[in-house]
Amino acid sequence: MRIHYLLFALLFLFLVPVPGHGGIINTLQKYYCRVRGGRCAVLSCLPKEEQIGKCSTRGRKCCRRKK
């Protein structure tokens, strides 16, 4: 029965996100960008695009064509 506590503790340590990584947040931001009709740009948006948000905590921009 004690092994269950050890396994639970190890599972918990693997599921806790690393500070600064933001894996779940980045995934949600990318999904929200796609829902709004945008794309994730690495550096900046193209000249005929406008920035409508962010795709990650590290600075990727969500861009879509200007209306």
Curated annotation (Swiss-Prot):
Tissue distribution: Highly expressed in skin and tonsils, and to a lesser extent in trachea, uterus, kidney, thymus, adenoid, pharynx and tongue. Low expression in salivary gland, bone marrow, colon, stomach, polyp and larynx. No expression in small intestine.
Entry annotated with the keyword Transmembrane: no
Listed GO CC annotations: extracellular region; extracellular space; Golgi lumen
Pfam families: Defensin_beta (PF00711)
Major location (coarse): secreted
Location(s) in or outside the cell: Secreted
Gene3D superfamilies with a match to the protein in the record: Antimicrobial Peptide, Beta-defensin 2, Chain A
GO BP annotation list: cell chemotaxis; defense response to bacterium; defense response to Gram-negative bacterium; defense response to Gram-positive bacterium; killing by host of symbiont cells; killing of cells of another organism
Induction (record text): By bacterial infection and by IFNG/IFN-gamma.
InterPro entries reported for this sequence: Defensin_beta-like (IPR001855)
Keywords tagged on the record: Antibiotic, Antimicrobial, Defensin, Disulfide bond, Secreted, Signal
Disulfide bonds: C33-C62, C40-C55, C45-C63
Signal peptide annotation: 1-22
GO molecular function terms listed in the Swiss-Prot or TrEMBL record: CCR6 chemokine receptor binding; chemoattractant activity
Entry annotated with the keyword Secreted: yes
Stated family: Belongs to the beta-defensin family.
Annotated function: Exhibits antimicrobial activity against Gram-positive bacteria S.aureus and S.pyogenes, Gram-negative bacteria P.aeruginosa and E.coli and the yeast C.albicans. Kills multiresistant S.aureus and vancomycin-resistant E.faecium. No significant hemolytic activity was observed.
Protein name per UniProt: Beta-defensin 103
Species: Homo sapiens
